[in-house]
């Protein structure tokens, strides 16, 4: 080994080689081309065709013998390595192969690199001779292609047949063309070689589960109930054919793919849309969402009262009111026509309307108008009826009327035996001490015709003969239209009986006047002449005699304009006012049976037996257009009947 000293001399050129983590061979370094030994460097040397070191280390016969093995090894290494090829000689390549065949050690570097292995098959640098041997790469084809052929020749471990195909064969092989699940398992173990050794419980869990899945997921298999008790079902081939192979999974009826459910859901959606469209079309005003309220414009249709009683929107409840009030609130009715109907009062929320009430179409015809006059004529001699109502500025208030029956010998202000307690909000008031002012804001400039006076024949008689007053009262009014803009009106609506004229306000109640007084004196202050605080108040009343053949009630217009604090005016609510109720009793009202003063500031409000402060704070202040305060006008009041007052201000923020 005379070459050992020479190898030691060239060791400094191979300092980057000691890398035991990879032992990459060859290392593409330019220093390799300057080395004198071809065996020490696997890289091709500069270009010497005959290397004396190679001839000295290995005889030429052995080098020629190794060349064939080297070429076969190169064919295996072609696919895994793709290094740039450097030009070299055949002798250098043969010498490198010989060095690998001697033991895999770097024989030239035994002194330093004894532990560095160079396995020839995995890391060969394809030297230059590869380009001279084109038939070498096809040699790798059979080696690499054999596993691919074996894997592509079979779809499954037992062959090309799928589970569904095996199940089909099993069912067809039976005499009755049907098998139970356990019989299918037995056929698999007996007929398919792959499953012969997999019949036990431990090794059969996987493929048996696959068979169950294929039976349930393929449409070509159907399940038939077994006649015997305690026996599993039969599995048969679908006589209709079904789909061969895998079909889409058959899911249970769900919301997504069930056609019947989709159809029923579509029908339900159509019904819901039609109901919503019908409700939206019921009202022509911005308050159409409250079209089923008795006082809304949409409620004055031919719908019966029982429909109103059965449908009550959530927005009318106390828990979901708009501004915190306890009474439902309607939107402004500015876009109503001249003939549209205003609503003055809402029904009480705590009471339910009777379902046996007549419909509007039955009680609003002209024939019932004449019957109303006859009924009113019956009342003119024996009794007079006083109705006390209250309404908020935008006609947005629930009320329960107070009925007072007085004999002819007594005045209108005498105590009455029958009444119904007035309730509003949280204030509890005595009904006889509660005769508030009726206010209504209206910007109309023309009178609306008295097109409906809702009273059925004989209902007024029932009012007199009944032991207790009716439980509900819905009062609606035709558009008055005489109020000035930005003003509140005090209406005096007097409906005269047949052949009677409007007398002075101080007369007895022998005339058939049904009044809505804005102030009601204590029964102890009953006088022959109605006087507010002892004052005789001037008034202007336009009366017209009622003729026997007229079908419309004659109105009495009493426009009054009373200046009140901070330029707030209260002008008369003149025009026609037809009053109707759920019970069908027609009532007409005069807001003042007394003479009104020209200036209300001079009145002694202490003697008024109504809670004016509660009314102003709770009712009048709820209107959006009202912005005033009565603190400096209303002194400390003492009510003779102990009226419970509330200082809560329900003004919407």
Swiss-Prot record:
The modification Phosphoserine is found at residues 210, 216, 232-233, 247, 254, 285, 296, 317, 320, 323, 327. It is found in: Cytoplasm; Nucleus. PROSITE patterns: FORK_HEAD_2, FORK_HEAD_3. GO terms for biological process: apoptotic process; autophagy; cellular response to cold; cellular response to hyperoxia; cellular response to nitric oxide; cellular response to oxidative stress; cellular response to starvation; DNA damage response. CDD domains: FH_FOXO1 (cd20060). Residues 209-216, 232-235 are annotated as: DNA-binding. Residues 35-64 have a biased composition (Low complexity). Keywords: Acetylation, Activator, Apoptosis, Autophagy, Cytoplasm, Differentiation, DNA-binding, Methylation, Nucleus, Phosphoprotein, Transcription, Transcription regulation, Ubl conjugation. Residues 119-140 have a biased composition (Pro residues). Residues 307-324 have a biased composition (Polar residues). The record marks 156, 163, 223 as: DNA-binding. The modification Phosphothreonine is found at residues 24, 331. GO terms for cellular component: cytoplasm; cytosol; mitochondrion; nucleoplasm; nucleus. Residues 361-457 are annotated as: Required for interaction with RUNX2. GO terms for molecular function: chromatin binding; DNA-binding transcription activator activity, RNA polymerase II-specific; DNA-binding transcription factor activity; protein phosphatase 2A binding; RNA polymerase II cis-regulatory region sequence-specific DNA binding; sequence-specific DNA binding. Disulfide bonds: none annotated. It comes from the Eukaryota. InterPro entries: FH_FOXO1, Fork_head_dom, FOXO-TAD, FOXO_KIX-bd, TF_fork_head_CS_2, WH-like_DNA-bd_sf, WH_DNA-bd_sf. Residues 1-64, 117-156, 232-335 are annotated as: Disordered. The modification Omega-N-methylarginine is found at residues 249, 251. A motif (Nuclear localization signal) lies at residues 249-251. The modification N6-acetyllysine is found at residues 243, 246, 260, 263, 272, 421. The keyword Manganese does not apply. Transcription factor that is the main target of insulin signaling and regulates metabolic homeostasis in response to oxidative stress. Binds to the insulin response element (IRE) with consensus sequence 5'-TT[G/A]TTTTG-3' and the related Daf-16 family binding element (DBE) with consensus sequence 5'-TT[G/A]TTTAC-3'. Activity suppressed by insulin. Main regulator of redox balance and osteoblast numbers and controls bone mass. Orchestrates the endocrine function of the skeleton in regulating glucose metabolism. Interacts with LRPPRC. Interacts with RUNX2; the interaction inhibits RUNX2 transcriptional activity and mediates the IGF1/insulin-dependent BGLAP expression in osteoblasts Interacts with PPP2R1A; the interaction regulates the dephosphorylation of FOXO1 at Thr-24 and Ser-254 leading to its nuclear import. Interacts with NLK. Interacts with SIRT1; the interaction results in the deacetylation of FOXO1 leading to activation of FOXO1-mediated transcription of genes involved in DNA repair and stress resistance. Binds to CDK1. This is Forkhead box protein O1. It comes from Ictidomys tridecemlineatus. The gene is FOXO1.
């Amino acid at each position: 080994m005379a070459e050992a000293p020479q190898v030691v001399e060239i060791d400094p050129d191979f300092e980057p080689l000691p890398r035991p983590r990879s032992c990459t061979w060859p290392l593409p370094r330019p220093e390799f081309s300057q080395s004198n030994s071809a065996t020490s460097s696997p890289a091709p040397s500069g270009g010497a065709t005959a290397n004396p070191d190679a001839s000295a280390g290995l005889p030429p016969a052995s080098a020629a013998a190794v060349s064939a093995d080297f070429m076969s090894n190169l064919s295996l290494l072609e696919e895994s390595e793709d290094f740039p090829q450097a030009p070299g000689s055949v002798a250098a390549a043969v010498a490198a192969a010989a060095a690998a065949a001697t033991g895999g050690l770097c024989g030239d570097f035994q002194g330093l690199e004894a532990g560095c292995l160079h396995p020839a098959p995995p890391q060969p640098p394809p030297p230059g001779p590869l380009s001279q041997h084109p038939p070498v790469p096809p040699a790798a084809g059979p080696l690499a292609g054999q596993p691919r052929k074996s894997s592509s020749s079979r779809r499954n471990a037992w062959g090309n047949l799928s589970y569904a195909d095996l199940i089909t064969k099993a069912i067809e092989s039976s005499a009755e063309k049907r098998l139970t699940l356990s019989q299918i398992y037995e056929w698999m173990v007996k007929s398919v070689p792959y499953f012969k050794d997999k019949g036990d419980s431990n090794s059969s869990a996987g493929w048996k589960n696959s068979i169950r899945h294929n039976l349930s997921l393929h449409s070509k298999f159907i399940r038939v109930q077994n006649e015997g008790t305690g026996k599993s079902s039969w599995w048969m081939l679908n006589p209709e054919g079904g789909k061969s192979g895998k079909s889409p999974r058959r899911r249970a009826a769900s919301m997504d793919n069930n056609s019947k459910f989709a159809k029923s859901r579509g029908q339900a959606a159509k019904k819901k849309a039609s109901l919503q469209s019908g409700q939206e079309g019921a009202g022509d005003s911005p308050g159409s969402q409250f079209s089923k309220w008795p006082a809304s414009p949409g409620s004055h249709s031919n719908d019966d009262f029982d429909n109103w009683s059965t449908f009550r929107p959530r927005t009318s409840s106390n828990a979901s009111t708009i501004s915190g009030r306890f009474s439902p609130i309607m939107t402004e009715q500015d876009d109503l026509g001249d003939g549209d109907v205003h609503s003055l009062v809402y029904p009480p929320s705590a009471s339910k309307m009777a379902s046996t009430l007549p419909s509007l179409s039955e009680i609003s015809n002209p024939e019932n108008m004449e019957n109303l006059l006859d009924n009113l004529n019956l009342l003119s001699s024996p009794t007079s009826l006083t109705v006390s109502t209250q309404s908020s500025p935008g006609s947005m208030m629930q009320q329960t009327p107070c009925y007072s029956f007085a004999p002819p010998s007594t005045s209108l202000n005498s105590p009455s035996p029958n009444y119904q307690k007035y309730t509003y909000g949280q204030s509890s008031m005595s009904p006889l001490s509660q005769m508030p002012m009726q206010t209504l804001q209206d910007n109309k400039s023309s009178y609306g015709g008295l097109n409906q006076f809702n009273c059925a024949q004989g209902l007024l008689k029932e009012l007199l003969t009944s032991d207790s007053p009716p439980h509900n009262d819905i009062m609606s009014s035709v558009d008055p239209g005489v109020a000035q803009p930005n003003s509140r009106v005090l209406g005096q609506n007097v409906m005269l009986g047949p052949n009677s004229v409007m007398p002075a306000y101080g007369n007895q109640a022998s005339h058939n006047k049904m009044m809505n007084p804005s102030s009601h004196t204590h029964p102890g202050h009953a006088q022959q002449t109605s006087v507010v605080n002892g004052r005789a108040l001037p008034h202007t009343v336009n009366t017209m005699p009622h003729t026997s053949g007229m079908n419309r009630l004659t109105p009495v217009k009493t426009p009054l304009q009373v200046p009140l604090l901070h330029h707030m005016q209260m002008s008369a609510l003149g025009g026609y006012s037809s009053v109707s109720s759920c019970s069908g009793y027609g009532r007409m009202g005069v807001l003042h049976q007394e003479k009104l003063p020209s200036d209300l500031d001079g009145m002694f409000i202490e003697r008024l037996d109504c809670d004016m402060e509660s009314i102003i704070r709770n009712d009048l202040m709820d209107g959006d257009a009202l912005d005033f305060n009565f603190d400096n006008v209303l002194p400390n009041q003492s009510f003779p009947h102990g009226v419970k007052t509330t200082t809560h201000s329900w003004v919407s923020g």
